[in-house]
Amino acid sequence: MLTIRDTAIALALFVAATPALAGSMVKVVESGEAGEPMTLTMDQTTVPAGDTTFMVHNDATTEEHEMVLVKLKSPDQTLTVVKAKHRVDEKTLKSLGEVADLKPGADGQLKAKLVPGTYMLFCNIKGHYEAGMHATLTVTK
């Protein structure tokens, strides 16, 4: 016969082991090689506020990629690209973290606590943002 204590322990273990109760998960795939189109895609573009884990996969065969996460001031905000460097000027942004230096075929993850608003995910390796490696994520209440 289960005691109240045993039931409480079992419930606590179940809750701790259930990923769905731990927040949202967004799967991100980065792909593209030099001279070809480059993409950053997500399996969902809207998540509720709270803890979010980004599972990032570099699907390229020869190119290294990264993923930077920033909160935009408004949904229509554009990021400033330093033309001479072919990179987004990260000094003007508040990064919430990044998955850096993903080798071809590699995986990485980023955990962040998100508040409602619009976010951008992008690769800031030289020329990759300009080649299309960016996507927006909407976080709801």
Residues covered by each model-derived region:
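Beta-strand cores of secreted/periplasmic/IMS beta-sandwich domains, seen most often
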Residues: D43-L69, G108-M120
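Extracytoplasmic beta-sandwich strand-turn segments characteristic of Greek-key/jelly-roll folds
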Residues: S74-L114
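Short edge-strand/loop segments of extracellular domains
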Residues: K71-Q77, V139-K141
